[in-house]
Amino acid sequence: MRTLVICLLMTFSIPMSVSARNILPLPAHQNELAIVIDDLGNDMKGTEEILSLPVTLTIAVMPFLPTTKDDAEKAHKNGHEVIVHLPMEPMSGKASWLGPGAITTSLSDEEIKKRVEEALEEVPYAVGVNHHMGSKATADERVMRIVLGICKERGLFYLDSKTTGKSVIPKLAMELGVPYLENELFFDDVYTIQHIGKQARLLSKALDRDDATIAIGHVGVTGMKVATMLKEFLPLYEKKASIVPLSDLIPEYHLIDESMP
């Protein structure tokens, strides 16, 4: 049924970006919010607390780490959506921050393809991909053409976390017919509870304005702070929007998914 998938993708004449406010067939009374939690896969702080939250989250799991499969299994069992949190080269930072199997601009086409495919096999239940770090790699057209090409082959969507203003993902996703979305807000780009609270309030204001919104938080250093913040703010968010998995923000996604063999 691959032909059906391609035909459906080609009907998307507008980018499936959260920043495009009115592209979704939403109920008149309700907006939609997708909350993504990055960096699972290494038994990080806040993992259990976040996976136990009583809403549907999108859980981004890093491949090749000690609890990669376990965290993906737990997320799926708890009703969350799972995506692959693919480690990709940043403009700066320690190589150790990337983790194993990172996609870098120095790799050959063949090695990039191999690493991406291995990463996808590592994370059970994954329906999409986003990147870990990646400010350099996501600005590289050669690298991202390979990554997005594999997403298309496998029927996966891509979330551009927007770690650089020079991302080539929107351009290439449109060209290749890959469903993509764009992050609007990081809860914890600064690690303090004051900043996380400020971002949580900004998100609340965005829900008054936007049909569809995506926000990203993390386990790890800020994991417990993010979990605490979400427990506090989720009742407010639920008054303003339906909290949904990322795939719900993509027109026709479920029809595409059901057409896969």
Model-derived features with residue positions:
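Positively charged n-region of N-terminal signal peptides that target proteins for export
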Residues: 1-5
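Alpha-helical scaffold elements lining the catalytic groove of polysaccharide deacetylases
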Residues: 97-98, 102-121, 138-143, 170-207
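Active-site beta->alpha N-cap acidic-glycine motif
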Residues: 26-96
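Catalytic beta/alpha-barrel core
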Residues: 40, 58-64, 130-140, 154-165
